[in-house]
Every structure is written in structure tokens, then in C-alpha cells.
């Protein structure tokens, strides 16, 4: 059997995968033969297309249309990079409907009013790596800028419910909701938004992000560490631009702006260290003994190498397995 692969880094999505489904984690990151990538789903494609639209718009506003055409933020380039062909043009059409509402309701301008105050260059879609507590971490922030008080804001867009027949409601604790339909929540904060003056000069929610949506907190805290903040630091701002979609592609655009609790960050690092220890010790399934864990990995690898169609195992069928690859 070929030796296992070893990932160079852990990311928030990798940690979540290992905690949720060790089998899937093994097949994605450890198995000697990489599992074929799953096709991009419709919700993922709509989110990626929206992401392309907003980042193109921001770059055009900051640097001009002609300058943007020559960069990776050209719209055609972003869409090609982020959306798989089988999802187009449908995903882009839905994303355009949502993006128009994001602009019209004022959510985009609400964000850019803060971005334009940045004391440093605004960065989007960039890779950061850092070893924290012995764990090599990797992140890819959607948007990063500074406040006039030189505090960093780490921002991510989330499109929720774009292809759901029932739609979704925004996560609790948002600072402001905006839409083009004149709903009763338009222009208002969620009841769990507890305004607190932050060292950044911005108003944040005293109800920490890890208390409302822990995966968002995991993601943005990881980015903050990789950008140089110490574990437990709350001097940076975690911002989520959420587009919650109801039936008929009616979007409610809300902004979540808060911090991630110091103790929660330390527990997050503990989780990363546990995952990295599992990788380095080749003991992926912590609920099993080391021997049972290795055996489960061998079984998954063997199953991956088997042909999809096992009908040839019936009498008279030709069946070949590349045993040298096992």
C-alpha cells in the first residue's frame, strides 16, 4: 500500500470536516490516492458567483474599471475561477438578482463607507499561512481592511438559502438588516444585538460571534491568527455580510459585526492541536484504537480503488483490479 499523504496545513474547513466526518477527512486529505472532488453544488455556485460580483465591484470602485480588467478581479476571470461550468449560467443569473438587491438596499454602500476609511491597502481573496501552537494554519480571507484606529477588520460574505424552496432567516445578532421590500425589520438590529464601543472605533455586538455562529467564529479567528494576532486577542473585528434568501429570490442583507471570545479562541486552538496530532500520529479516528484507526484507513483506501460498477463480479464477467496500486 502507498504511504498516506500528509496535509501541509489545516484550515477551518478541514478542521470542521475532521470533527464532523473522519471518514471524509481521511479520503480528502490523508488517503494515498486523492478522492475525486465532489461537483460544486448549486448553493455553493451561487455563493461563488455572488462573491465574484461583489469583489469585482469593490475593485472597480477602488481602482477603476480599466485597471480592474487587467487583474484577477476582472469579472470574467473571477467567475471562471470560482464557478464550475455545469453550474452556469444559472448560478450567475441568481447571483445577479441577489447582488442587485445588495446594491439597491444600501448594504453594499454601508460596507464601502467603512472600507474607504481603511488606513492600509484593502485586500481581497488572498492566502495567509502561519504556524500557531505547533499547527500550520491556512486561511483565505474574503476581505481585509483597517479602521482609522489601525484595527483590522476581517470580513466574509455568506449567501444562505439561495436555492432552497423554503428559504432561510438571517442568523441571530445582526447589527442591521436591509432589504428592498420594505419589511418590518428593514433598517433595524436584531434583538440580540448588544451595541458595544470597540477599540477599533466601530460598534460591535457584545454577544460574541462564537455564541451565535461558531463556524463563522472558527473561520475568522483562524484568519486573524494567520494575520498576526495572538490567540485570544479581541482587538480585531469579525464582520459577516450575510445575504439570507427567501422564496422568489427575496434577499435580506444583514451585517454581523462582533469579536470572538478569548476563551473560545483558546479552545479552538486546542481543537486544531488535537486534529494535527491525529494527522501526525496517523490516528485519524480518535474513537478507535490506533490499530483500528489504521485498519479503517486501509479499508477506505481499498474501497476507493475498487471500480464503481461491481456487476462484473457476477459469474462470467471480466474483473480486473490493479493490485499493485493497493
Regions found by a protein language model. Name each.
Residues 10, 178-217, 222-326:
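Metal-dependent nuclease catalytic regions and adjoining charged, substrate-binding loops involved
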Residues 49-126:
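A non-catalytic, helix-rich entry segment at domain boundaries
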Residues 31, 54, 58-62, 145, ...:
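Hydrophobic/aromatic-lined pockets within catalytic cores
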Residues 126-219:
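Non-catalytic protein-protein interaction segments used by genome-maintenance enzymes to assemble
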Residues 8, 12-63, 96, 124-125:
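Nuclease catalytic cores
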Residues 64-65, 132-134, 147-151, 231-234, ...:
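Short, solvent-exposed loop/turn segments that connect beta-strands within catalytic domains
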Residues 26-27, 35, 161-166, 246-250:
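Short catalytic/ligand-binding loop motif for oxyanion handling, primarily in non-cytosolic enzymes
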Residues 2-7, 23-36, 77, 154, ...:
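Short amphipathic alpha-helical segments and their helix-coil junctions
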Amino acid at each position: 500500500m502507498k504511504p498516506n499523504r500528509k496535509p501541509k496545513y489545516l484550515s477551518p474547513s478541514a478542521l470542521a470536516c475532521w470533527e464532523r466526518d473522519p471518514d471524509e477527512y481521511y479520503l480528502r486529505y490523508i488517503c494515498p490516492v486523492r478522492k475525486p472532488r465532489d461537483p460544486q453544488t448549486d448553493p455553493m455556485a451561487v455563493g461563488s458567483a455572488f462573491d465574484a460580483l461583489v469583489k469585482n465591484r469593490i475593485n472597480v470602485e477602488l481602482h477603476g474599471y480599466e485597471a480592474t480588467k487587467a487583474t484577477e478581479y476582472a469579472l470574467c476571470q473571477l467567475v471562471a475561477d470560482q464557478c464550475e461550468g455545469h453550474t452556469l449560467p444559472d448560478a450567475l443569473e441568481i447571483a445577479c438578482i441577489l447582488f442587485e438587491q445588495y446594491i439597491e438596499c444600501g448594504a453594499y454602500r454601508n460596507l464601502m463607507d467603512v472600507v474607504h476609511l481603511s488606513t492600509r491597502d484593502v485586500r481581497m481573496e488572498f492566502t495567509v499561512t502561519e504556524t500557531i501552537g505547533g499547527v500550520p494554519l491556512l486561511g483565505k480571507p474574503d476581505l481585509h481592511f483597517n479602521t482609522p484606529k489601525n484595527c483590522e477588520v476581517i470580513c466574509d460574505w455568506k449567501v444562505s438559502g439561495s436555492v432552497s424552496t423554503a428559504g432561510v432567516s438571517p442568523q441571530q445578532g445582526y447589527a442591521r438588516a436591509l432589504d428592498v421590500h420594505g419589511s418590518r425589520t428593514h433598517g433595524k438590529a436584531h434583538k440580540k444585538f448588544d451595541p458595544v464601543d470597540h477599540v477599533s472605533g466601530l460598534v460591535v455586538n457584545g454577544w460574541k460571534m462564537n455564541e451565535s455562529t461558531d463556524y463563522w467564529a472558527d473561520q475568522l479567528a483562524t484568519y486573524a491568527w494567520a494575520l498576526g494576532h495572538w490567540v485570544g486577542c479581541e482587538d480585531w473585528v469579525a464582520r459577516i455580510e450575510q445575504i439570507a434568501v427567501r422564496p422568489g429570490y427575496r434577499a435580506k442583507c444583514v451585517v454581523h459585526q462582533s469579536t470572538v471570545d478569548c476563551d473560545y479562541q483558546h479552545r479552538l486552538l486546542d481543537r486544531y492541536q488535537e486534529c494535527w496530532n491525529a494527522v501526525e500520529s496517523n490516528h485519524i479516528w480518535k474513537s478507535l484504537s490506533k490499530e483500528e484507526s489504521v485498519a479503517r484507513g486501509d479499508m477506505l483506501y481499498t474501497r476507493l480503488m475498487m471500480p464503481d460498477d461491481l456487476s462484473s463480479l457476477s459469474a462470467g464477467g471480466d474483473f480486473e483490479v490493479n493490485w499493485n496500486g493497493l
